[in-house]
Amino acid sequence: MLLIHFILMHKNIFKYPNLSIKNYEDSFTKDQADRWLESSLDELNWLEGEIKLFGKDIKIPRLQCWYADEGCNYKYSGKMLERNNWHPALLEIKNKIEVITSQKYNSVLANFYRNGTDSMGWHSDDESMLSKDSAIASVSLGQERPLCFKHKNEDISFS
């Protein structure tokens, strides 16, 4: 599965404090999604990244790549990601998402889950370089997987 983080939301689907999630189903045709998936798998600059965890460099269980506007950098878990210039398929997705959401996006962190063991752990997109009210768009192409949310301070989780 390829997860492209941009966030597509249309109606609030969860009613929790400090959480606004909207879901735009059927925003793209199957042909568009198939074309973007094939192009992304074949042409994006996938890297096997590492994060710093308890002072040690650990390989992350997925491939990823960072595409962004010039001058837009991203660092998490002690690692600065290598910025790539926009790929045409990602730019096409970005432009469609901007029309749907009426939001502007300046970057994408694409994650490729190669098999059933690749994953993303619980995390918060709270890096200091992100503004508090940043919109995050998430597009999933390929095999369907659950997208789960967990409250940081309360015992609430859902997918």
Region locations from a protein language model:
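Non-heme Fe(II) oxygenase metal-center motifs and adjacent flexible, charged/small-residue loops
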Residues: L2-S159
